[in-house]
Curated annotation (Swiss-Prot):
The modification Phosphoserine is found at S440, S443, S466, S478, S612, S615, S1453. InterPro entries: Ion_trans_dom, Na_channel_asu, Na_chnl_inactivation_gate, Na_trans_assoc_dom, VGCC_Ca_Na, Volt_channel_dom_sf. It comes from Onychomys torridus. Disulfide bonds join C276-C318, C857-C866. Belongs to the sodium channel (TC 1.A.1.10) family. Nav1.8/SCN10A subfamily. It comes from the Eukaryota. One of its GO terms (biological process) is regulation of atrial cardiac muscle cell membrane depolarization. Keywords: Cell membrane, Disulfide bond, Glycoprotein, Ion channel, Ion transport, Membrane, Phosphoprotein, Repeat, Sodium, Sodium channel, Sodium transport, Transmembrane, Transmembrane helix, Transport, Ubl conjugation, Voltage-gated channel. Ubiquitinated by NEDD4L; which promotes its endocytosis. The chain crosses the membrane at residues 126-149, 155-174, 188-206, 213-232, 249-272, 373-398, 660-684, 696-719, 728-747, 754-773, 790-810, 865-890, 1150-1173, 1187-1212, 1219-1240, 1245-1266, 1286-1313, 1394-1420, 1474-1497, 1509-1532, 1539-1562, 1575-1596, 1612-1634, 1700-1724. The lineage of its organism: Eukaryota, Metazoa, Chordata, Craniata, Vertebrata. Residues 341-365, 835-855, 1356-1377, 1649-1671 dip into the membrane without crossing it. This is Sodium channel protein type 10 subunit alpha. Residues 1004-1016 have a biased composition (Acidic residues).
């Protein structure tokens, strides 16, 4: 950490002069020379040493305060760069008034202007000026507004071009053009500007029609707003980041869609051309004539489209008189087809995005057959749900990563800031110790740092500061100002909160004293988009070898001893410090920060230094304080003077009375009730209304408005306006009341009637007392805050695309002057003639509906442009940006928030009021009961004692009793109540001594379940308060009870036998607890009672294992029965009852037997299956009908028998306390009742018919019996509270829109229709203007005045309409009706009310988008909660441990395998060498791709020749792949089938050959076989493509996620199937006879079980449910006939609207919102897991690769390799485990154990290499031990070898031996030389003389290379724990120091020479 505090003062800012430039040149030269020198010596500069730019000095950031105040004369002037990084770059910086940093190149601009040229300096000054940016931004915005207009003069366009040209010229003059850094074109945003300007000039120069396309690029100017507003750049960064991340998903999506498209092409090509054509009466006339004539087509009822058909048995059939023939055109303007790969791909993309896919589904099934539903199920579930949600998962992840990075930056910066302040603080202490009075400097304005407005600040806080600093006796904490300052300086004891849940979350500055960003001049915080400073304050100077911080010393008149003239800093020792700033900082830190210390400074400088320090601190802290103030101090003083009303004492008294009144809890309760009643009043509005009802509602409105106005007035007087308006809720109230008063003064029918809708916002006041609503509003608020920038980006995207559409395609839509569009003689609603309509089209695409608009566009304009535009909007806008929205939403959402809202410490008055009311009610009821008991002398207790009943906790009224005193104390002392606080555990009151419970006298025994239920009831209704310590003893017996239950808690791991004995002991020892008598309240009749625990036997019966052993049924009746009716209590020891007891035991054994259960499951399945046959055609099949009636009776008897058996076996008590048994009981009763009714011939009664339909619930009984479904149901049940919460909140949100809809549209959706047309048409408003005219003109009987079926006539219908809008199904009709509406009973007119579109846009954003995505949030969160509850082991591991754990887990499951041995036969060997080469695999992959391409070329109706060629090519590929298969089998022999992929290839080859053979056979027998079979066989070819997956790693990860999801998805699928099954049975019973219209026709209907399932599968994704509901909403003419006779007894083809609405809305909520979202939750969860696996440092693949490489080095799979081969092995590995050569030293340092023969075990190597990748961690020794044990168990080879040494030991021994050898040789050599020297004089001491050969020895030792440092290897010695003994002694004896210096190696050598290691 560099502490740049040394750099305060104005001296930081020095003008950039030619000398500065010369200095930079010198630095660059020195830097280059140093670099060359390093290169010459072969040194590599470490990565850590690379200097990086300081984050806080980035261009566009604001300069932090610490650098001092910028003198006015230097604003906009070139300055020397403060960032040391740029000391070797030819740059300078410029600061504007707002201290924003701009960097410029110091080279010559355009080779003409030097940095000191006057023209260039002026351009620089202009370009950095704030007003310049503001002017350009305003110009851009104005230009955008102009572009939305249709007919703009060309001159305006030229004006804008001139302004942009001027801007570009200024920037180019200031920056230079493109060659150097920081020049104009080096900024990518300027590319955009430049291209826009260039294109403008090109367009002006060449005025041609084709060039108008160029003009479209003007639109890109809107993007310039992004470059001007800095916050947006970050979001764009996140978007680009997520788009990059989408690469893998995009590849997978394209691959999957291609495969599905190929399947579609093979199955359905040409089918959609089949249409029903009139049979020709002329036998000679060829059919091809009639097939082309549109007049001959059969038109589908209610539409203008020809009816499709197919020739298959289950395809759609033609009516009589028509024949099914293939025509030339496909449906939807010939765009919907599978005729070629491109169209099939488009259809599949449409299916994936689920845009009107139900239409494609119906067309395809009608043309091909119902069996192809399977194709759609696969595509929707695997393609659509999986792929689209993968995109969501990836975008969410990318966003999270971006978020984490930003948060990390903020935190690092805060830490540095904190450290810097600590340094400042220390420095201040030093100065104080030196006797400089820092306090006197507080008022000093002479400091160069003193801010301009320091005087104002000084006056404001002078008194506080001086008090705090001069009075030594006062503690600093006693003053809030000081306290804040202390905590700010990091001196307080409390820790700061670091809660960054999201970067984009708005956090009020008051929440924590941290500096997320630079603070500007005016004390405003800058948003999180600014980059975060790595070093806050480091200055720079010109040193010799690198940038040096310049100290204020440089400018001081008489510097201290640490100063040199040239601006270099010297340490006190006098040495010149040079080098990088990091080195300097370290060095300075090492010397106790001498360069910061004030100790060696002389007096004048100390004073200046002190002023700087104090000035920095005060300036920063005061600025923080100011930023917290909402308005300027002068306004605050004014407000305090005039807005706090304190007059005479009487007024004050009046105020106190009002204060008591408005703060009373009952006032809050009253207001809440009024809000609820007011809301109900508003919701009661409907059409048509009687005048009396209307008058009542009006009167109610006036009363409520007056009431709320009074409330506001009272509160303002009681609190004073000053305090009243500081609360947001009060401001909210005030606005609503004002609008309500305004609305009362306006006539009801006025244009401002929409003001009434503002009253609806009162509903939000409920949030004050409804925590869930409050939380949700907060979530949406947070998201909207967080989404500010993103919303802006989305708005820009919509704006740009809308303009592009208008410019490119507008003219093609046949636009007229009034902005409407004509096409094919009809008006278009969706066109791009004007900006508003263009915006609507783009918005509709963002809602996911793109295909229909695109068809129209392709009809009127160029197909390619339409395709590109629409798909770009769809992919960019919908899939990326909207998913980023959802990611943000999920990020700010958590079910914790919903289930446990944070307690803000305030007493909830509503709860207090409710508690008071409750207490009053309980006291009243108690008084009454005590009165009756004293008079009537009831004797229940006596009965209880006769029966031997033990007292216990049971549910009774008295249980909810709270002492009145307790309530009063709570309210009086404002104790914190926790009434029904969801975050408390229901059992808390047992363990919490502060909770007061009054316990009633027990009535009989209760089992554990009852006890828990009672506890839950108690917790929800009991009043909690802090009670005095004395009262705590009263709960000790309850706590003891809790102690009894502990062992029975789930997961306690106690065996049932232990439990039995434990409970028995406890029971005996604590049978009669004593109760302390003190503190018992008179008012309670029951507090002194004992509370016993249940009998242990009772508990034991609840334990399943023991229940089996006991095999004895429970008591038959409940305690209540036996108490009230003693005859029910029987003695089993007496005669008649003994037999009964034996019977019960027998029944119990039967019921508990597994066979019995299996039989019942079988019966349930059979009976459910039987229901499926009761369809609409049953009356025509008398045999089937009679058989079904018979089987129905049989099933009913069986189920009744089962129920009776269970009653006898379990007893009533156990049977009726089980929820699943209740379900069985109800379903059996339904069957029984309907059977009895049938026998008594009452079956035609309507109510009994409805009862019969309830038999559809029978399959529900299967739920409890299938484990998979039960798991899902349990998970769902767990999520129900949260789901209900969200549902309720959605309803509240929607209520507002629904009431608004009723206000706007009630009665306005009616219209006059002409039924003579098909489909019915709306009569033009010029012919019929209103209802009466429609009735008068109905001469033909064809005119009907009808209402749109889904409308806003009342709030309930409004809800239905909103559900259709939110699911985007049927919303068009509702919108059209709204937009065309005029007045009540007036005929609608085309787009008369155009801007009503905006009502729907707003609802879709808030009501649809937010609320429906909250479902995803809730469910995902609940899954995660439950996962944590179930598998908590992960939570207690650190991230690092998890990495290790996962890596070890993976490598533990692997072991070396023998490679496939090379065959001995030379031919086989040759082939083996070919097929095992990588090149062979690559060739095969290329061939597969080519095969795929040839399959894509196929089209419908291709020529014979093309068919032949493609057939031959196919045969060639089959031959190639067969050849590959044969070669591999020949070479690999039996080993071929050991690989899964080989087996897959083999199957594909067999199928391919089979399909060729079958094709040949079928060709000759074409007339006998259906072509479908032929097509399905050809699909085998597609299997080959799937082999590509083998090669793509990214795709494998994503598919791995899918594979992991499959089990869970299967369970969810089962549940979904069950729901569909039940609903289809209901549908058959209720809607079989509705008229065929809209979505219901002869194929998609509820007449048979199969057809019902087709319909329900379609609406599982909510697709087309409006079409299915539409006919069911018909109640009479002209739509249906209620008197029509049908097949069966029921009459008419009208529907039942109520049943239909309930049926469809419940199904949509269950399937589309809940079950499908569970599916999504599972996918997201598993995707995260899979991605974690793939992003971990070591993946499964790395370990596989390790073992694959191992096989080459250890062909015999001995699991050992020679130490000599280790270096090659390490180098051969790939990926993170590889250790490239030269690696000898690293390997030796790993200290690997050696076994005899110098071999190393694979596990040791893998452990060491893994550690090399993951780094040190001391926590995992035990894990390694476990791993090794596991490995030993599976691979016994290792256990037989005990290590004898390690690689390090071996090296040391080797070196020691070498050293001794060399020394000895040297000695021998010298000796022989000496002895042979004839001049030598022999001496007696020769033998003991020291050897003179030390230099030689050292040289030899150095030769053997660098030795490892023992400190690097000590932790490795424990690596394989079993070898500790080998290495421990070694580490004790040997001490090796690592260094490249000879000096160190000398030491080692001498040591080794002295103590040789054991050999």
């Amino acid at each position: 950490m560099e502490f740049p505090i040394g750099s305060v003062g104005t001296t930081n800012f020095r003008r950039f002069t030619p000398e500065s430039l010369a200095e930079i040149e010198k630095q660059i030269a020195a830097h280059g020379a140093a670099k060359k020198a390093r290169a010459k010596h072969g040194e590599r500069k470490g990565q850590d040493e690379k200097p990086r730019p300081q984050l806080d000095l980035k261009a566009c950031n604001q300069l932090p305060r610490f650098y001092g105040e910028l003198p006015a004369e230097l604003v906009g002037e070139p300055l020397e760069d403060l960032d040391p990084f740029y000391s070797t770059h030819r740059t300078f910086m410029v600061l504007n008034k707002g201290r924003t940093i701009s960097r410029f190149s110091a080279t010559w601009a355009l080779w003409l202007f030097s940095p000191f040229n006057l023209i260039r300096r002026t351009a620089i000054k202009v370009s950095v000026h704030a007003w310049f940016s503001i002017f350009i931004t305003i110009t851009i915005l104005f230009n955008c507004v102009c572009m939305t207009q249709n007919d703009l003069p060309e001159k305006i366009e030229y004006a804008f071009t001139v302004i942009y040209t001027f801007e570009a010229l200024i920037k180019i003059l200031a920056r230079g053009f493109c060659l150097n850094e920081f020049t104009y074109l080096r900024d990518p945003w300027n590319w955009l500007d430049f291209s826009v300007i260039t294109l403008a000039y090109v367009g002006a120069a060449i005025d041609l029609r084709g060039i108008s396309g160029l003009r479209t690029f003007r639109v890109l100017r809107a993007l310039k707003t992004v470059s001007v507003i800095p916050g947006l750049k970050v979001i764009v960064g996140a978007l680009i980041h997520s788009v990059r991340k989408l690469a893998d998903v995009t590849i997978l999506t394209v691959f999957c869609l291609s495969v599905f498209a190929l399947v579609g092409l093979q199955l359905f090509k040409g089918n959609l051309k089949n249409k029903c054509i009139k049979r020709s009466t002329d036998p000679h006339n060829a059919y091809n004539f009639s097939s082309q004539m549109a007049d001959n087509f059969y038109i589908k009822n209610g539409t203008t489209e020809p009816l499709l058909c197919g020739n298959g048995s289950d395809a759609g059939h033609c009516p009589s008189g028509y024949i099914c023939l293939k025509t030339s055109d496909n449906p939807d303007f010939n765009y919907t087809s599978f005729d070629s790969f491109a169209w099939a791909f488009l259809s599949l993309f449409r299916l994936m995005t689920q845009d009107s896919w139900e239409r494609l589904y119906q067309q395809t099934l009608r043309a091909s057959g119902k069996m192809y539903m399977v194709f759609f199920v696969l595509v929707i579930f695997l393609g659509s749900f999986y792929l689209v949600n993968l995109i969501l998962a990836v975008v969410t992840m990318a966003y999270e990563e971006q978020n984490q990075a930003t948060i990390a930056e903020i935190e690092a910066k805060e830490k540095k800031f904190q450290e810097a302040l600590e340094v400042l603080q220390k420095e201040q202490e030093v100065l104080a110790a030196l006797g400089i009075d820092t306090t006197s400097l507080h008022s000093h304005n002479g400091s160069p740092l003193a801010p301009k407005n320091a005087n104002e600040r000084k006056h404001r806080i002078k008194s506080r500061v001086s008090e705090g600093s001069t009075d030594d006796n006062r503690s600093p904490q006693s003053d809030p100002y000081n306290q804040r300052r202390m905590s700010f300086l990091g001196l307080s004891s409390g820790r700061r909160r670091a809660s960054h849940s999201s970067v984009f979350h708005f956090r009020a500055p008051s929440q924590d004293v941290s500096f997320p960003d630079g603070i500007t001049d005016d004390g405003v915080f800058h948003g999180d988009h600014e980059s975060h400073r790595s070093s806050l304050l480091l200055a720079r100077g010109a040193g010799q070898a690198g940038p040096l911080p310049r100290s204020p010393l440089a400018s001081s008149p008489n510097p201290g001893p640490g100063h040199r003239e040239e601006g270099q800093l010297t340490a006190p020792t006098g040495e010149l410090t040079t080098g990088a700033p990091e080195d300097l900082a370290l060095e300075a830190a090492g010397q106790k920060k001498n360069f910061l210390s004030a100790e060696y400074l002389n007096e004048p400088f100390r004073a200046q230094r002190a002023m700087s320090v104090v000035s920095i601190m005060t300036s920063v802290i005061e600025e923080l304080e100011e930023s917290k103030l909402r308005c300027p101090p002068c306004l605050i003083n004014l407000a305090q003077k005039y807005l706090i009303w304190e007059c005479c004492p009487k007024w004050m008294k009046f105020k106190m009375v009002l204060f008591e009144l408005v703060t009373d809890p009952f006032a809050e309760l009253t207001i809440t009730l009024c809000i609820v009643v007011n809301t109900i009043f508003m919701a009661m509005e409907h059409y048509p209304m009687t005048d009396a009802f209307d008058a009542m509602l009006q009167a109610g409105n006036i009363v409520f408005t007056v009431f709320f106005t009074m409330e506001m007035a009272f509160k303002i007087i009681a609190f004073d306006p000053y305090y009243y308006f500081q609360k947001k809720w009060n401001v909210f109230d005030c606005v609503i009341v004002t609008v309500s008063l305004l609305e009362l003064s306006i006539a009801k029918k006025g244009s401002l009637s929409v003001l009434r809708t503002f009253r609806l916002l009162r509903v939000f006041k409920l949030a004050k007392s409804w925590p869930t609503l409050n939380t949700l509003i907060k979530i949406i608020g947070n998201s909207v805050g967080a989404l500010g920038n993103l919303t802006f980006i989305l708005a820009i995207i919509v704006f740009i695309f809308a303009l592009v559409g208008k410019q490119l395609l507008g003219e093609d839509y046949g636009c007229r002057k009034d902005g409407t569009a004509l096409w094919n003689e009809g008006q278009l609603r969706w066109h791009m003639c004007d900006f508003f309509h263009s915006f609507l089209v783009i918005f509709r695409i963002l809602c996911g509906e793109w295909i229909e608009n695109m068809w129209v566009c392709m009809q009127v304009s160029e197909k390619s442009i339409c395709l590109i535009l629409f798909l770009t909007v769809m992919v960019l806008g919908n899939l990326v940006v909207l998913n980023l929205f959802i990611a943000l939403l999920l990020n700010s959402f958590s079910a914790d928030n919903l289930t446990a809202p944070e307690d803000d410490g305030e007493v909830n008055n509503l709860q207090v009021a409710l508690a008071r009311t409750q207490a009053f009610g309980q006291r009243a009821s108690q008084a009454i009961s005590s009165y009756f008991s004293s008079h009537c002398r009831l004797r229940w207790p006596k009965v209880g004692s006769q029966l031997g009943v033990k007292p216990s906790l049971t549910s009774s009224k008295a249980e909810h009793h709270i002492t009145a005193d307790a309530v009063n104390t709570a309210v009086g002392t404002s104790a914190k109540p926790a009434l029904s606080g969801p975050k408390e555990d229901p059992r808390d009151f047992i363990t919490d001594a502060n909770v007061w419970v009054s316990v009633p006298i027990a009535e009989g025994e209760s089992d554990l379940d009852e006890l828990e239920e009672d506890i839950e009831q108690n917790s929800q209704s009991s009043w909690r308060e802090e009670s005095p310590k004395g009262q705590q003893d009263q709960l000790w017996q309850i706590q003891r009870c809790e102690d009894h239950q502990v062992p029975n808690s789930p997961g306690s791991g106690m065996s049932s036998e232990d439990l039995a004995s434990y409970l028995g002991e406890r029971w005996k020892s604590e049978a009669t607890p004593q109760v302390p008598a003190e503190g018992v309240d008179d008012t309670s009749s029951s507090e002194g009672s004992t509370v016993d625990c249940p009998d242990p036997e009772e508990i034991l019966k609840k334990i399943p294992e023991l229940a089996d052993d006991l095999e004895e049924p429970d008591d038959c009746f409940t305690e209540g029965c036996t108490r009230h009716c003693p005859c029910c209590k029987v003695s089993t020891s007496k005669f008649p009852w003994t037999t009964g007891w034996q019977v019960r035991k027998t029944c119990y054994r039967i019921v508990e037997h597994s066979w019995f259960e299996s039989f019942i499951i079988f019966m349930i399945l059979l009976s459910s299956g039987a229901l499926a046959f009761e369809d609409n055609y049953l009356e025509q099949k008398p045999r089937v009908k009679s058989m079904l009636e018979y089987t129905d009776r049989v099933f009913t008897f069986i189920f009744v028998f089962e129920m009776l058996l269970k009653w006898v076996a379990y007893g009533f008590k156990k049977y009726f306390t089980n929820a699943w048994c209740w379900l069985d009981f109800l379903i059996v009763n339904i069957s029984l009742t309907s059977l009895i009714a049938k026998i008594l011939d009452y079956s035609d009664v309507a109510s009994l018919k409805a009862l019969r339909t309830l038999r559809a619930l029978r399959p529900l009984r299967a739920l409890s019996r299938f484990e998979g479904m039960r798991v899902v149901v349990d998970a769902l049940v767990g999520a129900i509270p949260s789901i209900m919460n969200v549902l309720l909140v959605c309803l509240i949100f929607w209520l507002i829109f629904s009431i608004m809809g009723v206000n706007l549209f009630a009665g306005k959706f009616s219209r006059c229709i002409d039924t003579s047309n098909n489909p019915f048409s709306v009569v033009n408003s010029t012919i019929v203007n209103n209802k009466s005219e429609c009735r008068n003109q109905n001469h033909t009987g064809h005119f009907f005045w009808v209402n749109v079926k889904v409308n806003f006539d009342n709030v309930a219908m409004g809800y239905l309409a909103l559900l259709q809008v939110a699911t985007f199904k049927g919303w068009m009709d509702i919108m059209y009706a709204a937009v065309d509406s005029r007045e009540i009973n007036s005929q609608p007119q085309w787009e008369d009310n155009l801007y009503m579109y905006l009502y729907f846009v707003v609802f879709i954003i808030f009501g649809g988008f937010f609320t429906l995505n909250l479902f995803v949030g809730v469910i995902i969160d609940n899954f995660n909660q439950q996962k944590k509850k179930l598998g908590g082991q992960d939570i207690f591991m650190t991230e690092e441990q998890k990495k290790y754990y996962n890596a070890m887990k993976k490598l533990g499951s692997k072991k070396p395998q023998k490679p496939i041995p090379r065959p001995l036969n030379k031919y086989q060997g040759f082939v083996f060498d070919i097929v095992t080469r990588q090149a062979f695999d690559i060739i095969i992959m290329v061939l597969i791709c080519l095969n795929m391409i040839t399959m894509m070329v196929e089209t419908d109706g291709q020529s014979e020749e093309k068919t032949k060629i493609l057939g031959r090519i196919n045969q060639f590929f089959v031959a190639v792949f067969t050849g590959e298969c044969v070669m591999k089998m020949f070479a690999l022999r039996q080993y071929y089938f050991t690989n899964g992929w080989n087996v897959f290839d083999f199957i594909v080859v067999i199928l391919s050959i089979g399909s060729l053979v079958f094709s040949a056979i079928l060709k000759s027998l074409e007339s006998y076989f259906s072509p479908t079979l032929f097509r399905v066989i050809r699909l085998a070819r597609i299997g080959r493509i799937l082999r590509l997956i083998r090669a793509a790693k990214g795709i494998r990860t994503l598919l791995f996620a899918l594979m992991m999801s499959l089990p869970a998805l299967f369970n969810i699928g089962l549940l979904l199937f069950l729901v569909m099954f039940i609903y289809s049975i209901f549908g058959m019973a209720s809607f079989a006879n509705v008229v065929e219209e809209a979505g219901i026709d002869d194929m998609f209907n509820f007449q048979t079980f199969g057809n019902s399932m087709l319909c329900l599968f379609q609406i599982t994704t909510s697709a087309g449910w409006d079409g299915l509901l539409s006919p069911i909403l018909n109640t009479g003419p002209p739509y249906c006939d209620p008197n029509l006779s049908n097949n069966n007894t029921s009459k008419g083809n009208c529907g039942s609207p109520t049943v239909g609405i309930v049926f469809f809305t419940t199904y949509i909520i269950i399937s589309f919102l809940i079950v499908v979202n569970m599916y999504i939750a599972v996918i997201l969860e598993n995707f995260n897991v899979a991605t974690e696996e793939s992003t971990e440092p070591l993946s499964e693949d790395d370990f596989d690769m390790f073992y694959e490489t191992w096989e080459k080095f250890d062909p015999e799979a001995t699991q050992f390799i020679a130490f000599s081969a280790l270096s090659d092995f390490a180098d051969t590995l790939s990926g993170p485990l590889r250790i490239p050569k030269p690696n000898q030293n690293i390997l030796i340092q790993m200290d690997l154990p050696l076994v005899p023969g110098d071999k190393i075990h694979c596990l040791d190597i893998l452990f060491a290499f893994t550690k090399n990748v993951l780094g040190e961690s001391g926590e995992l020794d035990s894990l390694k031990t476990n791993m090794e044990e596991k490995f030993m168990a599976t691979n016994l080879s290792k256990a037989s070898y005990e290590p004898i040494a390690t690689t390090l030991r071996w090296k040391q021994e080797d070196i020691s031996a070498t050293v001794i050898q060399k020394a000895y040789r040297s000695y021998v050599l010298q000796r022989s030389l000496t002895l042979s020297n004839p001049l030598r004089v022999p001496r007696a001491e020769d033998d003991d003389a020291p050897l003179p050969g030390e230099g030689y020895v050292t040289f030899m030792a150095n030769d053997s290379g660098r030795l490892p440092d023992k400190s690097e290897t000590t932790s490795a010695t424990s690596f394989p724990p079993s070898y500790d003994s080998v290495t421990r002694g070694l580490s004790d004896r040997v001490n090796i120091s690592t260094s490249n210096s000879m000096h160190n190696e000398d030491e080692v050598t001498s040591k080794e020479g002295d103590s040789p290691g054991p050999q």
